[in-house]
Amino acid sequence: MVGLRFDNQTRSCHSNKTMFEDRIIQDIIDAWQHDQDHLERGRRQRSIPDFDSVRVLIETAFLASLNREEDRSITFSLALLQRDEIDEEQRTSGRSQLVMNFEIAEPLSVESILKLAPAVDSEMTSLAVERRDDGAQYQIWGALNYSPTTKRFNEIPGVIPELIYTRPDVLTISSRQPGSLLVSRANNLIGRFVGGEFIRATPRPFASGSMGSFLIRAVHTHSLYNRSGNEYWLIYRDALDYLLSEVASRSHGATIVLIPQRSLQHYEHERRFTYEYRFSRELGLRDLFIRLIEGPPGSMSGQIALRKLIEERLQLLAQLSAIDGALLLTDELDLISFGVTLNAPVWEGTVLIGPDAFGGGGDIFAHTKLGTRHNSTIDFIGKCPDCVAFVVSEDGPIRGIVQRDSSTLLCWPDCTESMFV
């Protein structure tokens, strides 16, 4: 990384020197192109973001993300869209936002982002950025407002389509952690910029051709699967996805381990973990799943109430991950213990990037450069072949880890389900 020169008035980047290597910016553009070109993803064909614009947004957003407001990390979202193209963009994409123009545009700079960030919720608003007419500078011309992304347990059925606003299908750079950026379009995550490197998102990590095959194998042993089949799998998958997203938002790094109930006593005997905190009763997720599958009595309101209850129980589970130590669950998502210490010898085998159901994966995953949390989890999975683990990094990615065979582990570098941001 090389130095930058700042203008004292705008704190904009004016140096012809750059922060990040060209290959990183190009990798972001290539990831966008690859995602758009893939037939199975059904993306709308649109122009590829230009190199200079990607660099300006990434570098300005990165610098802004390093700042704090009253000792808290700032969050914000930048969407690249020319003001005079908004009507055409909304018409062709079928996605609309509540567009609010500034009377006077603000220069795109670290200073302007820091001033505006507290006034907007990055889950519901992106600051609209365009290249000025002179082609040399960029400016923030307004705000694009939309409804936050919903999932099974917090969506409200029966909405009025014409009154719903959605994320724009344009290059969007979001910051939720210092030095960590999300690169997305609409609700689809293209990748994360973390530690000066770009990590492509894993498309559909819970698909059967990806990490999902290991989860499905466990789910097939559950009594609820025998009772309700694929409907149970879909609810289970969405519950796990929601749990991981809540853990990511509530903790500064965490480990979640799923252990088959039938193997728990064996691993206890082998002292593969040291319990710290245990409760004497369950949260009752399984019973709520049954009621949701079999249908609540009454109308739609009963369905919404059940989903809300499941959401609250998952939030309770997620909060337990905020203390030091791993969160241990059965593979049916029942709580075993939290604040747990994992015990296993150092893994001597190979760690590969897991398949992504679209032909990717298979490269060596360089885990040795990661911290203790990742490596202790890798060691644990190396000795507990029927377990599944997730490591939520402080800088954003959620990594999934399983054992493929006695000499090989698979790791998915970022397994945020559906690439939703």
List the model feature ranges, each with a label.
Residues G3-V421:
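Divalent-cation
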